[in-house]
Swiss-Prot record:
Name recorded for this polypeptide: Protein-glutamine gamma-glutamyltransferase 4
Gene Ontology process terms (BP): mating plug formation
Residues binding Ca(2+): 378, 380, 430, 435
Gene: Tgm4
Functional note: Associated with the mammalian reproductive process. Plays an important role in the formation of the seminal coagulum through the cross-linking of specific proteins present in the seminal plasma. Transglutaminase is also required to stabilize the copulatory plug.
Length: 667
């Protein structure tokens, strides 16, 4: 062919705005085009002459060093095949040709370079596609996709089962550097692995933890965060992933809700539907026997060298939505992924993906790590009394609780700023034949019922303490008889973190009462002075854990239970306008009163929003008892649209107090 007649590509327009809108990727803050696999995108190609029937246009899509590339030529067929990459002419006008390209629904995800007849057409990112029915992350409901893929804000649910608190969280999966960071975390995967949401999600989960190959977050539960950021300070995944991307170093520090928030962000960023999930009264079984063993002395104090298991007030992980083509049928849908460094799986700290369907049925052999998650949501709690007998210890089982683990499993409701209870997705109703059958299937043995003959039953009514006020407990004792009986009650109260880590014992309350009738209430009280001066001993939010033992004097029968009390603190008041303009100052006015009898130290108020470039803060060293402070924080919105502003208050003694408001930012 005469070189003067050779077909030459002069330019390629990736039609970023048009394609991004069609692929639901217009919010990504990147100069590169972001596409979803299995869906048509358009290219506008300028040639040196009109395209003729004998001409060839060859497109090469390359995913990087040592990675395969796809070569696609013009297809004369007008219809698209069911599989593979394809390219067709959509429109031709003189030297301008519009091409429609469709990637394979199981294509490698990641960063691509593209060449058209050796012309460098640029770079784009290819994501998983929940809108594509042939993609293994397909999600049928548009409302679900809007929530689990596109929503960049949400809530974490914290506290404990009887006193659930919501914590606003900014996922920010579209923000600058986030997508780059997520794909850089996956550079160690083989091409075939980058096709699978199962393997990609497991790899992302692994790389969230700094203990695994310099991953994103350093876990810290010591209460000393002096060389980093305290976990409770974070309210967004964005600064964490941005810092990791820029520095290539692990970010200090995280706890379970931070790990969950960042993992949810990363999964949504690469196109895998995801949600942060909270399990209240979450078991941590160190012996893999599907139960938690707690050992008490005769006053109700825990015995640390024997009590290796723990029950967390709450624990958070992330659910990801996908087909499980690597498993038998019936395990598609939500999968548990947990990047909090608790357990080793195949040599690294990670959990999952574990099918929620398998967890519910007790199918603990199903991959990955289903035994651990099953115990978290459906384990049993054994309480042992350790008795000293002639210098020897004797362990006596005094309580078996089959319904106290895995309460109020929660996530944000689709399309609403409310909590959704999804407990029955993870387990059958407590006490039902199906629930006990799942436990039997998981453990391989029938449940222990040797304590069912007990005549005395114990429970506790309270679930909170107003900070600065006495601890008041009401113990409820139930019997089948109305005969008067003397009962010894011993209640040990600890100050501990949400993971069950005991920081100090506040004291033991002991009382002997005569109970009459089939139900009796016994009041116990401890003055606030026993705890108020210990709140700042560690830089963590603290709760009160109580272990109560009741003994019938005549028969010696003992029963036990435990309770968790959270501290309540009155919120501060915040004023901000309902509307504001981009690039103009917005003023937030705060009013706060210290209602405690002790000074509050290391005061910090902060404002975060996806409408701001940076977090804004106001700090003060000390607020004396009874003192009221008023101040203003000024910030400048840089993005239009409805933007949620989160104002947080923290101090050494009081944590996790916040207010929020949506402000409409206009041009």
């Amino acid at each position: 062919m005469d070189s003067r007649n050779m077909l030459v590509v002069y330019s390629v327009n990736l039609e970023k705005k048009l394609n991004a809108a069609a692929h639901h990727t217009i919010e990504y803050q990147t100069q590169k085009l972001v596409l979803r696999r299995g869906q048509i995108f358009s290219l506008k190609v300028m040639l040196n002459r009109p395209l003729q029937s004998h001409d060839e246009l060859k497109l090469i899509f390359n995913t990087g060093h040592n990675m395969p590339f796809y070569t696609v030529e013009l297809d004369p067929m007008t219809s698209y095949r069911s599989k593979g990459w394809q390219v067709k002419i959509a429109k031709q006008s003189g030297v301008e040709v519009v091409l429609n390209v469709i990637s394979a629904a199981d294509a490698v995800v990641g960063r691509y370079t593209m060449n058209v007849n050796e012309f460098d057409a640029g770079v784009f990112f290819l994501l998983f596609n929940p809108w594509c029915s042939d993609d293994s992350v397909f999600m049928a409901s548009e409302e679900d996709r809007a929530e689990y893929v596109l929503n960049d804000t949400g809530y974490m649910y914290m506290g404990f089962a009887k006193q659930i608190k919501e914590k606003p969280w900014t996922f920010g999966q579209f923000e600058k550097y986030i997508l780059n960071c997520c794909f850089r975390l996956l550079t160690h995967l083989e091409p075939k692995e980058m096709q699978s949401p199962v393997l990609v999600s497991r790899a992302i989960c692994t790389m969230m933890c700094a203990a695994n190959n310099f991953g994103v977050l350093v876990g810290n539960w010591t209460g000393d965060y002096s060389n980093g950021t305290a976990p409770y300070v974070w309210a967004s995944s964005v600064p964490i992933l941005q810092q990791h991307y820029i520095t290539r170093m692990p970010v200090r520090f995280g706890q379970c809700w931070v790990f969950s928030g960042v993992l949810t962000t990363a999964l949504r960023a690469v196109g895998i539907p995801a949600r942060s999930v909270t399990n209240f009264e979450s078991a941590h079984d160190t012996e893999k026997n599907l139960r938690v063993d707690i050992y008490l002395d005769e006053s109700g104090k825990t015995i640390p060298h024997l009590t290796k298991d723990s029950v967390w007030n709450f624990h958070m992980w992330t659910d990801a939505w996908m087909k499980r083509q690597d498993l038998p049928q019936g395990h598609d849908g939500w999968q548990v992924l947990d990047s909090t460094p608790q357990e080793i799986s195949e040599g690294q700290f990670r959990i999952g993906p574990s099918p929620v369907s398998a967890i519910r049925q007790g199918l603990v052999q199903i991959m990955y790590d289903t035994t651990f998650v099953f115990t978290e949501v459906n384990g049993d709690k054994y309480i042992w009394l350790v008795k000293q007998n002639q210098e020897r210890e004797k362990n006596v089982l005094i309580a078996v609780e089959t319904a106290s683990i895995g309460k109020n499993i929660s996530t944000k409701m689709v399309g609403e700023n409310r909590r959704q209870d999804i407990t029955l997705h993870y387990k059958f109703p407590e006490g039902s034949p199906e629930e006990r059958k799942a436990m039997e299937k998981a453990s391989g043995k029938r449940p222990d019922d040797k304590l069912n003959s007990r005549t005395l039953h114990i429970s506790v009514l309270q679930n909170s303490v107003e900070l600065g006020h006495p601890i008041n407990l009401t113990i409820v004792l139930k019997r089948k008889t109305a005969t008067p009986q003397n009962v010894n009650i011993s209640c040990s109260l600890d100050l501990q973190t949400y993971t069950g880590n005991k920081k100090t014992n506040l004291g033991v309350i002991q009382k002997t009462v005569q109970i009459q009738g089939q139900e009796s209430e016994v009041s116990l009280s401890m003055d606030s002075s026993f705890y108020i001066y210990k709140l700042g001993m560690v830089d963590d939010e603290m709760v009160i854990k109580g272990f109560i033992i009741a003994e019938i004097v005549d028969s010696g029968e003992r029963v036990a239970t435990d309770t968790t009390l959270c501290f309540l603190y009155s919120a501060f008041s915040v004023e901000m306008p309902s509307t504001s303009k981009v690039n103009q100052p917005l003023t937030i006015t705060c009013n706060f009163k210290n209602t405690l009898p002790i000074p509050l130290t290391n005061i910090k108020f902060s404002v975060e929003s996806l409408g701001l470039n940076n977090m804004k803060s106001w700090e003060q060293e000390t607020v004396p008892p009874g003192k009221t402070i008023n101040f203003q924080i000024e910030c400048t919105p840089v993005k239009t649209g409805p933007r949620k502003f989160i104002v947080k208050f923290i101090s050494r003694q009081v944590k996790e107090v916040h207010a929020e408001k949506v402000v409409l930012i206009t041009k």
